[in-house]
Amino acid sequence: MKLLVVGSGGREHAIAKKLLESKDVEKVFVAPGNDGMTLDGLELVNISISEHSKLIDFAKTNDVAWTFIGPDDALAAGIVDDFNQAGLKAFGPTRAAAELEWSKDFAKEIMVKYGVSTAAYGTFSDFEEAKAYIEKHGAPIVVKADGLALGKGVVVAETVEQAVEAAHEMLLDNKFGDSGARVVIEEFLEGEEFSLFAFVNGDKFYIMPTAQDHKRAYDGDKGPNTGGMGAYAPVPHLPQSVVDTAVDTIVKPVLEGIIKEGRPYLGVIYAGLILTADGPKVIEFNSRFGDPETQIILPRLTSDFAQNITDILDGKEPNIMWTDKGVTLGVVVASKGYPLDYERGVELPAKTEGDVITYYAGAKFAENSRALLSNGGRVYMLVTTADTVKEAQASIYQELSQQKIEGLFYRTDIGSKAIK
C-alpha cells in the first residue's frame, strides 16, 4: 500500500521512515517534507499542509490507503474533517477533538469538569485583569498563550515583572497574533516533567513508552523555551506505579470526557505531565506526536507500524509491541540563534550510518549540488539506542564531536537528569 504523511519536520521524518519499514508498504509520500528525508527513500510532495483540497486530490490520484497527520496547526485547521468528508481515511483527531491542544482554556475546562489534576489557573483577554491576577498570586507563575505558538507560547516567569511583561507581549503587543489574544495564567508546579503518549480510537487507547523532553535552548535548562532540544525514552527513574496512576487519573478520564462532549478522539494524544509531591498533574495536552519525542519513541516500536495504524483506523485490536532494551536518546542540532533569529544555508555533515540515526527537520539541497544545507531553526537530530542513558549519551556526543557544525549548536546535557 501507499501512504501519505503530512508535515515537514523531524517528527514526520521519523513517522514516514518507520512506516516505510512495514512489509506491506511500497511507498511513503511526505507533503511537503524536507530534502533530508529523501536520503531514506521517502518521496516528497510539493503541497503545503494548508492546501487540504490539493492533498486530498493527491491522495485520491495516487491510491493512498490512509494519511498520517503530523503537525498541530493542520489538525486545528480541520484537515482530518476535510479528508473524512472526501471519503478518505486520516489518522489524527478532528478539529473539535484537537481543541484539547489548540485552546489551553478548553483543555483546562475539560480537566476541571472531569476531575483531572492540573495547576490552578485563570484565563484572560484583558491585560489589566491578567496583571491583577499575577500581582495577587505572585511568582513563580506561568503565562501561556491560549492558542498554538510553535511550542514557544509558554513563559515560566520567575518574577512578577517578567510575568506581567509576558502577558503584555501576548495581549497588547500581539506577539502570537490570535493565538495570544487570550492567555492562561497558572500556578507554577514543582517536580519532574515527563511525556506520556497513546494511540487512541474512542475509548480504546494504547500507551507508549514514557519520554522526557528538554525544552530550554541551553545546557542546565537555561534560555528560552524551544520546540525541544532532545529527549530520551523510557524515563528509567520513573516508577511504573506513577505511569499507571497517570493513565487511570488523567488519560482515561480525559478521553472518556471528550466522548461525552461529542468529540470522540482518533489519533495520538500527548499528555505533558509533571510528577509533583501530590502525584502526576497535567501541564498541557497535545493532539499529536511530540517533536522530538517521536524520534526516540518510534525506534523502540518492534511491531509493524503501518499495520498497527491500519488496525486502529479500522477499529480492530492492534498488536503493538515495544523493545524493552535499554534507552533511546536523541540530541537536536539547531541553527545558532534559535529559537529567535537564525541563519540558514549552513552546509550539513553527511548522514550518519549504523547505530546512530539522523532525522532531518530543516534541510534542503544546495541549488547546484547534493550538499544538504540548514533550512530551519531545528535542523536535524541524532538518535541511538543503548543499554543505559550514559552509553547512549556517549555514542551521540562522540558522533557530534566529529561533525563539522559551524553555525549550528546543540545541548551537551540531554539525558543527564536520568544519571543519578
Curated annotation (Swiss-Prot):
For this protein, the record's SUPFAM superfamilies field holds:
Glutathione synthetase ATP-binding domain-like, PreATP-grasp domain, Rudiment single hybrid motif
Q: Residue limits of the ATP-grasp domain?
A: 108-314
Q: What is its EC number?
A: 6.3.4.13
List required co-factors: Mg(2+); Mn(2+)
Residues involved in Mg(2+) binding: E284, N286
- Superkingdom per UniProt: Bacteria
Q: What remark does the entry make about the cofactor?
A: Binds 1 Mg(2+) or Mn(2+) ion per subunit.
Known catalysed reaction(s)?
5-phospho-beta-D-ribosylamine + glycine + ATP = N(1)-(5-phospho-beta-D-ribosyl)glycinamide + ADP + phosphate + H(+)
Q: Record-annotated residues binding ATP?
A: 134-195
Q: Which BP terms does GO give this entry?
A: 'de novo' IMP biosynthetic process; purine nucleobase biosynthetic process
Range of residues in the leader sequence: none
Question: Which GO molecular function entries does the Swiss-Prot or TrEMBL record give?
Answer: ATP binding; metal ion binding; phosphoribosylamine-glycine ligase activity
Keywords on record? ATP-binding, Ligase, Magnesium, Manganese, Metal-binding, Nucleotide-binding, Purine biosynthesis
According to UniProt, this protein's pathway is: Purine metabolism; IMP biosynthesis via de novo pathway; N(1)-(5-phospho-D-ribosyl)glycinamide from 5-phospho-alpha-D-ribose 1-diphosphate: step 2/2
Q: What's the top EC group for this one?
A: ligase
Q: Return the NCBIfam families for the record.
A: purD
Similarity comment: Belongs to the GARS family.
Instruction: Please state what the protein is called.
Output: Phosphoribosylamine--glycine ligase
* Organism name: Streptococcus pneumoniae (strain ATCC BAA-255 / R6)
Gene name of this polypeptide: purD
